[in-house]
Amino acid sequence: MKTFHGPTCGTAVSLCLLLFLTSALEEGEITSKVKFPPSSSPSFPRLVMVGTLPDLQEITLCYWFKVNRLKGTLHMFSYATAKKDNELLTLIDEQGDFLFNVHGAPQLKVQCPNKIHIGKWHHVCHTWSSWEGEATIAVDGFHCKGNATGIAVGRTLSQGGLVVLGQDQDSVGGKFDATQSLEGELSELNLWNTVLNHEQIKYLSKCAHPSERHIYGNIIQWDKTQFKAYDGVVLSPNEICA
């Protein structure tokens, strides 16, 4: 398999080449993955989405991930606005538990039946609905203990913010912390403006061939949405579950 190294940009570079995730794909490849090397100031490997999110009152956020360590907190997805740096945040702590923060409300922390193994691909889906504040996390197709209601009831995730993968934003696009970063890989990240049902989430967690995939994010679609890469992020072809 030929590895494609995606464009990277140092922190001093003001304009970065657009990173198209589809550019890593070759005929016969299943998908593309993004590798995040270790962070150490002033280098904070990350992907930054081009554009912003719309107002959202329901979401499903799913992705495949592989971690190289379980030390500190591993921040996967960060959406920050001028008013709230934790408008939407997903992470894993040192115990391998999953945390989910919506609209700056108290974090949902859950224990999942499938433990996280270093160097192994896992699939996770986060859902939230404003109507009753129901928030859930499912790992490898199984819902976790501790899913809750009453999370950010009646709230709206606001448009105009910035999506960053692999780092935690303590201000829009900045104030990163090397102990709050992802050291590992991400693939097949999709975001919907609705709550997917259990059957759909179970389906997404399976190792399906591209011809069998029919569920793609309508807000973020892994093979369509444009990102900018910074500080040594590497893009390459990937076969999920290989």
Curated annotation (Swiss-Prot):
According to its UniProt record, which cofactors does this protein need?
Answer: Ca(2+)
Q: Which positions bind phosphocholine?
A: 60, 63
Q: What does this protein do?
A: Might serve the role of immunoglobulins.
Q: What is the lineage of its organism?
A: Eukaryota, Metazoa, Ecdysozoa, Arthropoda, Chelicerata
Binding of Ca(2+) 1, residues = 85-86, 169-170
Q: Write down the glycosylated positions.
A: 147
Annotated residues for binding of Ca(2+) 2: 170, 180
Instruction: Give the record's cofactor note, including how many are bound.
Output: Binds 2 calcium ions per subunit.
A single GO cellular-component term from the record reads: extracellular region
**Positions of disulphide bridges:** 62-125, 112-144, 207-241
Q: Name one GO molecular function term.
A: metal ion binding
The identity of this protein, by name, is: C-reactive protein 1.1
Query: Is Disulfide bond found in the keyword set?
Result: yes
| Signal peptide coordinates | 1-24
Coiled coil regions, renumbered to chain = none
**Which InterPro entries did the record assign?**
ConA-like_dom_sf (IPR013320), Neuronal_Pentraxin_Related (IPR051360), Pentaxin_CS (IPR030476), Pentraxin-related (IPR001759)
* Residue span(s) of domain Pentraxin (PTX): 30-241
Q: Where in the cell is it found?
A: Secreted
A Pfam family name for this chain?
A: Pentaxin
Keywords attached to this entry = Calcium, Disulfide bond, Glycoprotein, Metal-binding, Secreted, Signal
User: Quaternary structure?
Assistant: Homopentamer. Pentraxin (or pentaxin) have a discoid arrangement of 5 non-covalently bound subunits.
Keyword Disulfide bond appears in the UniProt entry: yes
Q: Which family does it belong to?
A: Belongs to the pentraxin family.
